[in-house]
């Protein structure tokens, strides 16, 4: 039995660094056989074994703690990564939700707008029907006129392909009339370019009476649905004075213009020749060519307004007035004429030739029988030197007006042969002829109209003011040049007293004799002015001549010379018709 019991070895799991301890013998059967050990030794062994066990437990505890810390760190890292990914997913989901909400809001707004638009569209027809019964604001006559012109131009564009290019001047007298009389009030603004602005105007063709109805009246003037009443309104509109310009002194009826041309054609053999035409050059040829290009008319009365209109057009081209840059130039139906700058260049060449003839002493052939007035005006233009474009155009306009006035004086009491521009005069026919031939007038208007002032008086006032200002500036400039010459001459004389002693004495004697002669006429004025000038010169110390110090013997002579020169200079200044009390300070 004892042989079967094997020895049991207990191996301690101690690291290699510790000291090896002898194994503990736990056999009981051997004790009995072995002798009894000392208890002190036995107690020491037990204590050593307890210490060893405690050390092993501490080591195992440390190992477990280290392993736990490693696993805890790994788990925290994984948890943080998962949290970050989760946060990212949440943010992405939130952004998607916001985008979806925005899209839904936009879609809702679009749907609401569409619903609102449909609702408004459904409500608009009854509102329009309700507004038709109510009263509206009355449109002004100018607005109606603009709308009528727009409709006429529209109908003209429709009729142009059928009628072709055979539009004559006599078929549309009203359009020629408005083109001739539509000049701007802003006459002082120069043209911006040499050519007139290219506005597209179309000549209306032959208008059908069926389609030529007036515009629909406003609600305050009830709608007219009866055809007979519409025809009556068409007739009234054709003869209504609303379509004409509101300047009563400039505007005459078409029948009166026909009568005037008839009278002028009786007095003159041909409208485009003789003293009645201001232009014997290319403009007259234009009128003849255009008159020949007109289609033959069965009645001679239809040719008269055409001639009148063409002559009026030539007068307007000859004037070449300014046009406002803010308003369009109405060149409806007018032929291709030279620009205002080209016209001014031609007039400038003509004036140069006439001034050369005047310098040579050759009398100028005047168209209106008044060569003196024309030559004086040309000399006035030549005296300017090189004026700017605005002054040149003003002087050309004044020259033409002076020629027209001379013609009126020559042909006093008769019909004026030259068709004047609307800015020149407002009287077309003499009062005797108007008294004998009175044409029926239109019925008076229903209400008053606020029209601007007549263009003739306004333009004349502007031109007169500008001309007066220009003359005043010229006069002041000449006076300034004259005074500068006198001052420079006197200063040179004072700077060189020794060389001009004899001349100063001679001038002093001559001035004294002239002063004695003129003393009876203006003694008081000159005495006052001379006293004022001498006092001021005495106070200021007017003339100080810087020279080298001279001997005491020559002091008296120099003082006498200076006094004589001062007196001569003051007498020269006073003798030039200056205002009394005019003081001149000479500083050397």
Curated annotation (Swiss-Prot):
Region named Interaction with MEF2 = 136-154
For this entry, list what GO says about its biological process: B cell activation; B cell differentiation; chromatin organization; determination of adult lifespan; DNA repair; heart development; inflammatory response; negative regulation of DNA-templated transcription
Return the annotated region ranges for Interaction with CTBP1.
Answer: 23-27
Is-annotated flag, keyword Heme? no
> Where in this protein does the record put region Interaction with ETV6?
218-261
Species this protein is from:
Mus musculus
Q: What happens when the gene is disrupted?
A: Mice do not present any abnormality at early age but develop cardiac hypertrophy by eight months of age.
Could you tell me which residues carry Phosphoserine?
22, 220, 240, 450, 552
Family listed = Belongs to the histone deacetylase family. HD type 2 subfamily.
Highest taxon of source? Eukaryota
Which InterPro entries would you find in this protein's record? Hist_deacetylase_Gln_rich_N
User: Where does this protein have compositionally biased stretches of type Basic and acidic residues?
Assistant: 110-147, 208-219, 233-242, 514-525
Return the EC number.
3.5.1.98
**Which tissues does the record link to its expression?**
Expressed at high levels in heart, brain and spleen. Expressed in skeletal muscle.
Post-translation changes: Sumoylated. Phosphorylated on Ser-220 and Ser-450; which promotes 14-3-3-binding, impairs interaction with MEF2, and antagonizes antimyogenic activity. Phosphorylated on Ser-240 by DYRK1B; which impairs nuclear accumulation. Phosphorylated by the PKC kinases PKN1 and PKN2, impairing nuclear import.
Question: For bias kind Low complexity, which ranges apply?
Answer: 264-284
Instruction: Provide the Gene Ontology terms for cellular component.
Output: cytoplasm; histone deacetylase complex; histone methyltransferase complex; nucleus
Which ranges are annotated Polar residues under compositional bias?
154-166, 185-199
Q: Which PANTHER family match?
A: HISTONE DEACETYLASE 9, HISTONE DEACETYLASE 9-RELATED
What's the protein here called?
A: Histone deacetylase 9
């Amino acid at each position: 039995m004892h042989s079967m019991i094997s020895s049991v070895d207990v191996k301690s799991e101690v690291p290699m660094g510790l000291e090896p301890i002898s194994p503990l013998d736990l056999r009981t059967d051997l004790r009995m056989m072995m002798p009894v050990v000392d208890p002190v030794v036995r107690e020491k062994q037990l204590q050593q074994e307890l210490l060893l066990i405690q050390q092993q437990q501490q080591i195992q505890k440390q190992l477990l703690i280290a392993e736990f810390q490693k696993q805890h760190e790994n788990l925290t890292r994984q948890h943080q990564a998962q949290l970050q990914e989760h946060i990212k997913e949440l943010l992405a989901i939130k952004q998607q939700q916001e985008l979806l909400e925005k899209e839904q809001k936009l879609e809702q707004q679009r749907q609401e707008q569409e619903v609102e638009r449909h609702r408004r569209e459904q409500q608009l027809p009854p509102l329009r029907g309700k507004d038709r019964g109510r009263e509206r604001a009355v449109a002004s006559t100018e607005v109606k006129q603009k709308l009528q012109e727009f409709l006429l131009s529209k109908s003209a564009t429709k009729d142009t392909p059928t009628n072709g290019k055979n539009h004559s001047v006599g078929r549309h007298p009203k359009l020629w009339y408005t083109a001739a009389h539509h000049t701007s009030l802003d006459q002082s603004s120069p043209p911006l370019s040499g050519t007139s602005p290219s506005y597209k105007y179309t000549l209306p063709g032959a208008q059908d009476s069926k389609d030529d109805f007036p515009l629909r009246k406003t609600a305050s003037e009830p709608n007219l649905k009866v055809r007979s009443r519409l025809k009556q309104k068409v007739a009234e509109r054709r003869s209504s004075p609303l379509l004409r310009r509101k300047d009563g002194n400039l505007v005459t009826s078409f029948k009166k213009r026909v009568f005037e041309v008839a009278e002028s054609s009786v007095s003159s053999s041909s409208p485009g020749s003789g003293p009645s035409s201001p232009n014997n050059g290319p403009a007259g040829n234009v009128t003849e060519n255009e008159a020949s290009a007109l289609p033959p008319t069965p009645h001679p009365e239809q040719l008269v307004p055409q001639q009148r209109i063409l002559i009026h057009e030539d007068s307007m081209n000859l004037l070449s007035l300014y046009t406002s840059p803010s308003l369009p130039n109405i060149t409806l139906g007018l032929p291709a004429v030279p620009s205002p700058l080209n016209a001014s260049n031609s007039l400038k060449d003509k004036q140069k030739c006439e001034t050369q003839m005047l310098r040579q002493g050759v009398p100028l052939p005047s168209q209106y029988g008044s060569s003196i007035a024309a030559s004086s005006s040309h000399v006035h233009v030549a005296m300017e030197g090189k004026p700017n474009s605005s002054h040149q155009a003003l002087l050309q306009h004044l020259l033409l007006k002076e020629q027209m006035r001379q013609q009126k004086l020559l042909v006093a009491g008769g019909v004026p042969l030259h068709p004047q521009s609307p800015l020149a005069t407002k009287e077309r026919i003499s009062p005797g002829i108007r008294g004998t031939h009175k044409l029926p007038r239109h019925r008076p208007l229903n209400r008053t109209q606020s029209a601007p002032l007549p263009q003739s008086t306004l333009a004349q006032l502007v031109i007169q003011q500008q001309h007066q200002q220009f003359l005043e500036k010229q006069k002041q400039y000449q006076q300034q040049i004259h005074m500068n010459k006198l001052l420079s001459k006197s200063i040179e004389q004072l700077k060189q007293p020794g060389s001009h002693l004899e001349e100063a004495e001679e001038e002093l004697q001559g001035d004294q004799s002239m002063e004695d002669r003129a003393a009876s006429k203006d003694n008081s004025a000159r005495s006052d002015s001379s006293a004022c000038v001498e006092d001021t010169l005495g106070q200021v110390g007017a003339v100080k001549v810087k020279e080298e110090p001279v001997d005491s013997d020559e002091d008296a002579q120099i003082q006498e010379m200076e006094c004589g020169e001062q007196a001569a200079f003051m007498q020269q200044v006073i003798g030039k018709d200056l205002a009394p009390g005019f003081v001149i300070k000479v500083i050397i």
